[in-house]
Amino acid sequence: KLKAIIEENQAQDYIHLKGHQDLTEVYKDYELYLSGSKSEGFGLTLLEAVGSGLGMIGFDVRYGNQTFIKDNENGYLIPRFEKDDEPAIVAALAEKIVAFFNRSDLDHVHQVSYDIAKGFLTEEIEQKWLNLVKEMTSHD
């Protein structure tokens, strides 16, 4: 359906559907993942980035960022702004980027990200489901 919309609008020269891309090798070239969205769900890119041990910076929005960013541990959560004050938002983001690269404990940052990601390994998720099913089916 997306392909048809792209063709209908003659946009195939500049819109290309690439499918899922494995970014594991790409993440190895970076130290930091920035999540600039003002709303976020459980994002696969967030999980991939934290699983690659990257430092994380994002806005303190419900779900995704709060799940993967432990403020002052593996990066920074930037408080939400009540209104769209773009200069203040950009300044807050820039301040946290500078603070991140001024840290002397980047090895700790990377380890915290790895530790967060461990909770999302297939074996961990399977065990959580098994525990839930056992809890729900036990007759006390």
Predicted regions located by residue number:
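A short, well-ordered alpha-helix in the C-terminal region of glycosyltransferases
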Residues: D105-G119
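Short hydrophobic beta-strand element within catalytic cores of glycosyltransferases
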Residues: G55-F59, I69
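A short hydrophobic beta-strand element within the catalytic core of glycosyltransferases
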Residues: Y33-L34, I57
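Short alpha-helical donor nucleotide-sugar binding micro-motif in glycosyltransferases
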Residues: H20-Q21, E25-Y30
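Active-site donor-binding acidic/aromatic loop of nucleotide-activated sugar
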Residues: Q12-H20
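C-terminal alpha-helical cap of glycosyltransferases
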Residues: V98-N102, G119-D140
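Aromatic "clamp/platform" in nucleotide-sugar-dependent glycosyltransferases that forms part
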Residues: K38
